[in-house]
Amino acid sequence: MTTIEDIIRIAVNAHDGMKDMVGNPAVAHVLAVGLMGKNPLEQKAGFLHDVVEDSDITLDDLRAEGVEEDVLIAVDLLTHRPGMSYEDYVKNIVISRNETAIQVKLNDLHHNLHRAELALMTLDTSTRERQALLDEILSIAAMHDRAERYIQRSIVKDR
């Protein structure tokens, strides 16, 4: 069984040298999403949610490191595969009924929205660049809203 510290080490190493859309270390995002988790399972999945998608690390590599199967299942669901539409990707998470993956995806969207808003406020950019960033913020916000509504509808259907 891996500790939170082991998982953080894996995430930090996987994102070493990577930058986000405004030049900040990409690892800051996965650390933030992990810290948003309400329990160790959500935290571990949050720290690892972009590892398979953004690096050469595979689910089998994580398994070999001792990452628990519950975490691997969530990370697998949270990995956006090439060729899959974003809408289908989110639907797969919701359809899975995997509470960990669903909560981590909501945390991910929430943090993406927050950092895009911060970037818009702090970047010294041209009007065109600001508009592009604003468009991205609105797109993230719309995805967040659609995902939350879809999840809520799915939860209500189960009751």
Explain the meaning of each model-derived region.
Residues 1-159:
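Active-site helical microenvironments for divalent-metal-assisted chemistry
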